[in-house]
Curated annotation (Swiss-Prot):
Protein source organism: Haemophilus influenzae (strain ATCC 51907 / DSM 11121 / KW20 / Rd)
Pfam families given in the database record: Glyco_transf_4, Glycos_transf_1
Main location: membrane
Enzyme class per UniProt: transferase
Annotated SUPFAM superfamilies: UDP-Glycosyltransferase/glycogen phosphorylase
Entry's Gene Ontology molecular function annotations: glycosyltransferase activity
Recorded superkingdom: Bacteria
EC number: 2.4.-.-
Transmembrane region(s): 267-287
One GO term (biological process): carbohydrate derivative metabolic process
Record's GO cellular component terms: membrane
InterPro entries xrefs: Glyco_trans_1 (IPR001296), Glyco_trans_4-like_N (IPR028098)
Protein name as annotated: Uncharacterized glycosyltransferase HI_1698
Lineage: Bacteria, Pseudomonadati, Pseudomonadota, Gammaproteobacteria, Pasteurellales
């Protein structure tokens, strides 16, 4: 069977990119593929990895391109040759800088799996260079949505791009979300681009009107202290629960009522797909083509103008006050989530390996 390698920034991170990469790798391993992870940082995965999958960690995070570029590239090349890989899947365009050189003159299929939106501005220079390297060196570029695929094609005039959605493997076992839980949920790294400061300002308006409701934010990150201080300054700390990153996110989906996504940028957010599977209506900022694909306005939730606090308040308020509307949107979320089942998505991956 084919030997597949996933080259990833940090296998130990608890983000959606890591979770979905592990989900796909696990599914391939279960179907007989010989799968390995090569990680620049971390050697202990946060999410469960199939026992048949090998993990090779360089322990190079944080790295400096000036100091570490050639050592990381050299190590990657050595591992690719040692493992006799047929295909290397690069998870995130920011690390294309290493794989583009590491695979020179090696007869290996080279695939970029881009999880970030085409217009994401973080680490701009590295990501721009990564795009050009992907177009010139990769056999395939995988985007998460058709809209992102179109953006790549319009910019680079290339036909080696395919869209494959993120698959969901997290399904409800016992119970679904319900309005009576009186909980608004948001899950993600506590980073500035996740927009949790906007969510707290939204909640400040709603908390006064619905004192028996609460907001749960599940995740860890560098903005945690700032967000807790903001909650205190907004006088909402008693109704906001900050919960550290966890493997048992299912518990929070099934015990909540509405999922809220205040992000400034996203790819195709796995947390939204998972929330939909548990019957959570979604209220989100329209921050990317991926979010627009998942949230059909007034069907399974509300798509709000970017950073428009008033619109987000209105969407949440409508769901809280209308049990019939809530049930309609909850059912629609569950139905739409079925398009992202792992069985369907993994066949698309097998088609390009």
């Amino acid at each position: 069977m084919k030997k597949i390698g996933f080259f990833i920034m940090n296998i130990g991170s608890a983000g959606g990119t890591e979770r979905v990469s592990i989900n796909v790798a696990n599914a391939l391993a279960k179907q007989g593929y010989d799968v390995s992870f090569i990680s620049i940082g971390g050697n202990k995965p946060f999410f469960q990895v199939d026992e048949k999958i090998n993990i090779y960690a360089m322990n190079k995070l944080p790295y400096s391109l000036k100091k570490d570029y050639f050592s990381i590239t050299k190590k990657l090349r050595e591992l690719v040759k040692e493992l006799q890989l047929d295909t290397l899947i690069v998870v995130d365009g920011a690390i294309m800088l290493f794989s583009a050189l590491a695979l020179v003159n090696l007869n290996i299929k080279h695939i970029l799996w881009e999880h970030y939106s085409f217009n994401f501005t973080g680490n701009r220079l590295v990501r721009t260079l990564g795009k050009y390297l992907a177009v010139t060196t990769c056999d395939k570029i995988v985007t998460l949505t058709e809209a992102e695929k179109t953006l790549w094609q319009e910019k680079f005039k290339t036909n080696n791009i395919i869209s494959i959605a993120n698959p969901n493997t997290l399904l409800p076992k016992n119970k679904l979300a319900k309005l009576e839980n009186k909980t608004i949920l948001s899950v993600g790294h506590l980073f500035s681009y996740k927009g949790f400061d906007y969510l707290l300002k939204v909640w400040q308006v709603l908390a006064k009107k619905y004192p028996d409701w609460n907001l749960k934010i599940v995740g860890s990150g560098e903005e945690e202290e700032n967000l807790k201080n903001l909650a205190k300054a907004l006088d909402i700390e008693d109704s906001v629960n900050f919960i550290p990153r966890t493997n048992d996110v299912s518990f929070y989906y099934e015990s909540s009522s509405i999922y809220c996504l205040p992000s400034q940028t996203e790819g195709l957010p796995l947390v939204v797909i998972e929330a939909m599977a548990f019957g959570l209506p979604i209220v989100a900022f329209n921050c990317s083509p991926g979010v627009k694909q998942l949230v059909e306005h007034k069907e399974n939730g509300f798509l709000c103008e970017q950073n428009n606090i008033e619109e987000m308040v209105k969407g949440l308020d409508l769901l809280i006050n209308n049990p019939e509307l809530y049930l309609q949107m909850s059912d629609k979320s569950r139905l739409m989530s079925e398009d992202y089942g792992i069985e369907k998505i993994i066949e698309e991956w097998k088609g390009i390996l």
